Amino acid sequence: MQEKIRRKSSQPVYLYGMKNMLRIGNKLYTRTSKNKKVYGEDIIRFEHANYREWRPDRSKLAAAILKGLHNMPIGESSSILYLGASTGTTVSHVSDIAPSGRIYAVEVAYEPFSKLLDLAEQRDNIYPILEDANLPERYRFFVDHVDVIYQDISQRNQIAIFKRNMDEFQPRSAFLVLKTRSIASTEDAKTILRKTIEQLSSYNIREVIDLSPYDTDHYLILVDAKGVRR
């Protein structure tokens, strides 16, 4: 059931100059035309529109926003390559943010991909791809253009995967969710972060967000391609 916002509580604020993202106190929401839950999230009504709660315990991008992410390269008409789409929890919110854009959602495991397919059937801007993100040449033909890459992959070679896709698609900006324990389970997380920053020296590092307490030893890194001016 939808609930009305009580304006006397926390003041609602649109984020990044877009009405598709709303913050009320410590809660995030994305505007949706579907009025349908994806993963059991709450739906509220605000300014004659429906908004789905975007939970930071279920989405690392939501966690980064609540932790103070200053820049949002994803706009209403952006084309996004999402690596590690899983069942589509965060993908669904990116779909809300970019209603006139495209989300190319890559997932290698069939079980979560089947749920991603169900989501894509309900949303015209999600293009699911059952493929290995290690091999971008296999899905290059399917992707017309990429403005932003978002990667959330639990593999030891996640940095190599990121750089391979950056080279293949040449986006202006990209998010890398760094999962340090997937790279080395015993090495200090900050040491892994430092080494990762060194490996990303060919890009402009714009922000590094520690995702704790939502995700321990996880970081979200936002980069721009060299030469991109803001």
Curated annotation (Swiss-Prot):
Family the entry assigns: Belongs to the methyltransferase superfamily. Fibrillarin family.
Organism: Thermoplasma acidophilum (strain ATCC 25905 / DSM 1728 / JCM 9062 / NBRC 15155 / AMRC-C165)
GO molecular function: histone H2AQ104 methyltransferase activity; RNA binding; rRNA methyltransferase activity
Subunit structure: Interacts with nop5. Component of box C/D small ribonucleoprotein (sRNP) particles that contain rpl7ae, FlpA and nop5, plus a guide RNA.
Gene3D superfamilies to which the protein is assigned, alphabetical: Vaccinia Virus protein VP39
NCBIfam families reported in the protein's UniProt record: PRK04266.1-2 (NF003276)
The organism's place on the tree of life at top rank: Archaea
Protein name in UniProt: Fibrillarin-like rRNA/tRNA 2'-O-methyltransferase
